[in-house]
Amino acid sequence: MEQNWFFPPHQGIRLGDLANQIGAELLDISAADRTVRAVAPVYRAKPGDICYMLSRKNREELQTCRAAAIICDKAISSLVPDTIPVLLTSKPHTAFALAGTLLHERAMRPSYNTSERGVAPEAFVDPTARLEAGVEVEPMAVIGAGAEIGSGTRIAAGAMIGQGVRIGRDCTISAGASILCALIGNNVIIHPGARIGQDGFGYAPGPKGGMIKIVQVGRVIIQDHVEIGANTTIDRGTMDDTVIGEGTKIDNLVQIGHNVRIGRYCGIVSQVGIAGSTQIGDGVMIGGGVGVNGHITIGDGAQIAAMSGVASDVPAGERYGGIPARPMRDFLRDVAEMALRSSERQKKKGGKDE
């Protein structure tokens, strides 16, 4: 890949210092003064780059690697050529993530859209809104009446912050996002096009066969260190709040219904849909394309496999998959049984479809 001007390399960190900061052991102390400037994949890492390897199946990539160092565990370290210093750790994935935050701090948040700082003259800030010192508002953003925004927060171009919304400190609200009826904590990242705080989907049968809209007068509460992906939608509560717990990370194109409560440090992958009033515990991981029924509970630490349909409660710590979702061991047994029956059926027919 040619030089990437979107994310320029770091001015340089000593390899020895980097090892200390990411909690890894530098096996070759004589390499401590090498300079590291960027991250790169193993196969094209060059001097100044740092890379990592998790699996032996990629060992061939080491033949073209010229990295300043490689992060790996003990099982991989024996494969690394003597010319490449090893940063040894039992958690190479985590160590590499930490290295990336140090070398590419600018890439950790959505980029600026303008070179200006402060409040752009093309932005609209209602006279009753309160902005702490250090807030940045890009052109065409709108800050509604009575909104409050903490210092260090950046509101990107075209974003809309509704009346009375509270946003904490050091947040990033990206281009084109809209936030209504919400209280947002500190160090929250909201990516482009996200929609937060709009009406939930609630209707009652009408007297003549139509539908009557149920009023949605709740809020959205987003706690500290949450990240919300592009074009994700989070509806406000009907009468209670929709809550996203501290440290939870939500991918792009996720729909979260009204009154949903998501715990702390959860991971929710793209195209998940969570129906209203479902409660999700702490540390829950939900794979891509999962549908979650409303008014159910998913316990702490549960894991849901991609493309599953969760129709009923999931106990804490369990791994569920399939449609309807069930314990993973049962799901895999059912899949194996169906594959066996299909194979036997094909044999009886001589391998030809009817």
Swiss-Prot record:
EC number(s) from the headed UniProt entry: 2.3.1.191
GO terms, biological process: lipid A biosynthetic process
Reaction catalysis annotation: a UDP-3-O-[(3R)-3-hydroxyacyl]-alpha-D-glucosamine + a (3R)-hydroxyacyl-[ACP] = a UDP-2-N,3-O-bis[(3R)-3-hydroxyacyl]-alpha-D-glucosamine + holo-[ACP] + H(+)
CDD domains for the chain: LbH_LpxD
Domain of life: Bacteria
Gene3D superfamilies, alphabetized: Hexapeptide repeat proteins (2.160.10.10), MurE/MurF, N-terminal domain (3.40.1390.10)
Function according to Swiss-Prot or TrEMBL: Catalyzes the N-acylation of UDP-3-O-acylglucosamine using 3-hydroxyacyl-ACP as the acyl donor. Is involved in the biosynthesis of lipid A, a phosphorylated glycolipid that anchors the lipopolysaccharide to the outer membrane of the cell.
Similarity section: Belongs to the transferase hexapeptide repeat family. LpxD subfamily.
Stated name of the protein: UDP-3-O-acylglucosamine N-acyltransferase
Taxonomic classification: Bacteria, Pseudomonadati, Pseudomonadota, Alphaproteobacteria, Hyphomicrobiales
